[in-house]
Amino acid sequence: MFRCGIDYTRCRWILPMLLLFAIIFDIIAIAAQSGWVEDQDAKTHYASMWKQCRGRNDQWDCKSLMEFSWAQAVAALMIIGLIILIFAFIISLVALCSTVNVSLLPFIGLLLILAVIVQIIALIIYPVKFNEQIYEGYYDYTWAYGFGWGATILTLGCAILFCCLPRYESEITGLEKTKYIYQSG
């Protein structure tokens, strides 16, 4: 695949493992309660995908963000992206780890591209709508929001690789013909 010496047979195990990491990152982003955004000092206001909390010290007043349609859309899109990602992971295990089924690889790539599109939409809607409706000063995006972007970037990379792998079917399956370089003269 690349001239720098990547072994094709290792791709059979690396790609599902990368998808597993993307799933874990997505779960962390979706389940995080500490917030996707927090105020500048992280002392008076923070908001996760599900709720926003205001207060000081240990006295926090939390309200659900699910009353906003944009927050419901973000939650739905992130969960749909996670479900598509899990489905693609299961298919990749079947396609690559038991027997190499190269015909499934472009389908997995398309599923992953769909998951990327859905999650990018969610990750863009959240800060735009948060700034329009809740913004009260300077906010920082936290590690949980970063995990959402990390999962999306990993998924995009895997999608590209899954779309490119069918070109290297003989190398992946180990049926590559030996190429001899010689000069006649």
UniProtKB/Swiss-Prot annotation:
Subcellular location: Cell junction, Desmosome; Cell membrane; Cytoplasm
GO cellular component, as recorded: cell-cell junction; cytoplasm; desmosome; plasma membrane
InterPro entries hit by this protein: P53_induced, PMP22/EMP/MP20/Claudin
Record keywords, A-Z: Apoptosis, Cell adhesion, Cell junction, Cell membrane, Cytoplasm, Membrane, Transmembrane, Transmembrane helix
Membrane topology category: Multi-pass membrane protein
Induction: Induced by UV irradiation of early stage embryos, this is partially dependent on the presence of tp53. Induced by tp53 expression from 10 hpf onwards.
Annotated transmembrane regions: 13-33, 74-94, 105-125, 143-163
Traits of the deletion mutant: Morpholino knockdown embryos show a decrease in apoptosis in response to UV irradiation during late blastula stage embryos (4 hpf). Gastrulation continues normally, however embryos show increased levels of apoptosis at the end of gastrulation at 10 hpf and develop a severely malformed body shape from 24 hpf onwards when cells in the skin and fin folds appear rounded. Significant increase in apoptosis of cells in the skin, pectoral fins and notochord at 30 and 36 hpf.
Gene3D superfamilies for this protein: 1.20.140.150
Any single biological process term in GO: apoptotic process involved in blood vessel morphogenesis
PANTHER family reported for this sequence: P53 APOPTOSIS EFFECTOR RELATED TO PMP-22, P53-INDUCED PROTEIN RELATED
Family according to the record: Belongs to the TMEM47 family.
Function: Component of intercellular desmosome junctions. Positively regulates apoptosis in the early-stage embryo in response to UV irradiation, this is partially dependent on tp53 activation. Required for the survival of cell populations in the developing notochord and skin, therefore required for normal embryogenesis beyond 30 hpf. Acts as a positive regulator of endothelial cell apoptosis in response to blood flow-derived shear stress.
Protein name per Swiss-Prot or TrEMBL: p53 apoptosis effector related to PMP-22
